[in-house]
Every structure is written in structure tokens, then in C-alpha cells.
Amino acid sequence: MKKALIAIGLILGTITVAIIGYGIYLYSSIQNTAGEMHEPLDRGDKSDKRDVAFDISAQDPFSILIAGVDSREDTHAGRSDTLIVLTVNPKEESIKMLSIPRDTRTEIVGRGTDDKINHAYAFGGAQMTIDTVENFLDIPIDHYVSINMDGFTQLVDALGGVSVENSFAFSQNGYQFEEGEIFLETGDEALAYARMRKQDSRGDFGRNDRQRQIVEAVIKQSAQFSSITKAGAILDAVGESVRTDLQLDGMWELQSNYRGAAKNIEQLEITGEGTRINNIYYLIIPQEEIARVQGELKSHLELS
């Protein structure tokens, strides 16, 4: 995963928590951070798959794409090693979380060729990635958040660590991860946990599970009262590492209107078969599997 995870709760929750905890003193800093993070899409506010733009104040279901970008420091160019789609339904107070395997072969919208889905970010940034994911899943992507490689460890460090449920014991990068509930104290430890693939019989699918676990853990951890005292460090990490089309007022409203959905997070999986085409490895997702996942996400978004 290469230091490339961010949760909607961190973006939509931590800034609000910081305002509550630090008051007006930090407000200008928060505004500056939100401004640094803001990177609008070429398409504007409306997905091509919606008749009208998503209205935050209407409290309707919406979707957000989390892209972990294979880049360092303050750059946001590179391939997306992690693609996670969240659909959020405030009426059901639930979130569905889908990891799209990075080797998934699909059409890269805007290039007219089939390739690995994680190449879309390198070819055309957030906009091409969103267009490609929308075409693949046949749902609107209303907002996006991207984080570069160096951001992940900073965010976990700022939160003071996260708890996850480990399905089997393994070691990675000098860390030993026991079976059962474990606490990942540092960003480096969380990174090692999330990146492990070769010791897992499920390969990338197992790694995707661990990525989703950490996203869920960050959502829950960022909502805790203890995060208030860490707001400054979190904001520093966010400002340097994250890009999003959301502005500060949108983050505030989403946090206010949708935070109840974090109580119920369901992890989804899409599966396929690996193959080699021209000696390049791809994951081929059967059409019936794509249709199954599309139907579940559309239902959660109340589109069908």
C-alpha cells in the first residue's frame, strides 16, 4: 500500500474536532490547511452520472473515492496503489467500503485503452481516475481524497495508533503481528501490516482486507475525544499529504450531516482471476461479479 491510506472520517471529522477543541485560535490554521488541500476537478462539482450535482445539505447518499498515490513528499503524481470507494447512506447510518484491486484490467477513460486501473492516476490524475472508476462501477463518484506515500505514517502517528483485528499471525519488516485484536502503535508499524502480501494465501485480496481495516480504524479513531489534543499534528499531516475537491464548508457540513454513518461500516470485496497478457499480470473481473458489486453500491446510493 506504500503509505497510502486516508479515511473519510479523518478529512470530515478531524478538522471539525480541531475547531471544537481549539476554537477560534486554530480556525485560520484550519482554513489554510483546507485551502492547501483543495484541488478541484476539471468536471466541476457534478458527476457526469448524476442529473444534478450532489447537494450536501440535502443529506442524500453520496460516494467518495480514496486514492493512495505512489509518490513522495509534496508531490501527488504517480500511480494509485490503493483505490477505495466509500458509499455513505445517512438514512441507514451506514458506509460500504470497496477496495478495487490495483491490477484490475479495465478501460482507462480518456485514453481509449484497457490497462491496470491504478495507472489512471499516472495518466490523468484524479479526474481520469474518477472517470475510470465511474465507468467501471457505473456509479457517480461525488468527491475524492488522495494521499501521497509519506502521508500515511504521519497520519497514524498523529492519531497515536489504531486497533485492528488480525486474522492470522505473521511478521513483516521486523514487526510481529499476533492473531486477534492488535494495536498498531506507529505509522511504520501500520504500514508494514497493510503492505504484507506474500505470506497471505489470498495475496492482494488479503492485503486489501488489511487496508480496509486501517481505513475503518482511522475513521473510528479520528472521531474519539482523544483526537482533539492531536489536532495540530493531524492538520499538519493532512495539509502536506492530502488533496481533495472538498472545501472547508463542505467538510464541515458532511461531518455534521453524515457522521452517524460511521457507526456501521461494511467491507465489500470484488474478486477475479489473475492472468498474463503480453507478459503483464492483470486481474480479470468477470462481468457477473462487476454487476453484483454495481448493484450493491447502487442500492446503497438509492440509485436503483
UniProtKB/Swiss-Prot annotation:
Transmembrane annotation, as ranges: 4-24
Cytoplasmic side: 1-3
Signal peptide per UniProt: none
EC number of the protein: 2.7.8.-
Broad class of the protein's primary localization: membrane
Source organism, top-level taxon: Bacteria
Location within or outside the cell: Cell membrane
GO molecular function, one term: phosphotransferase activity, for other substituted phosphate groups
Topology in membrane: Single-pass type II membrane protein
Pathway listed: Cell wall biogenesis
Gene Ontology cellular component list: plasma membrane
Keywords noted in UniProt: Cell membrane, Cell wall biogenesis/degradation, Membrane, Signal-anchor, Transferase, Transmembrane, Transmembrane helix
GO biological process terms on file: cell wall assembly
Enzyme class: transferase
Extracellular-side positions: 25-304
UniProt-listed Gene3D superfamilies: LCP protein
Family classification: Belongs to the LytR/CpsA/Psr (LCP) family.
HAMAP family referenced in this protein's UniProt entry, alphabetically: TagU_transferase
Function recorded in the entry: May catalyze the final step in cell wall teichoic acid biosynthesis, the transfer of the anionic cell wall polymers (APs) from their lipid-linked precursor to the cell wall peptidoglycan (PG).
Protein name: Polyisoprenyl-teichoic acid--peptidoglycan teichoic acid transferase TagU
Highest classification ranks of the organism: Bacteria, Bacillati, Bacillota, Bacilli, Bacillales
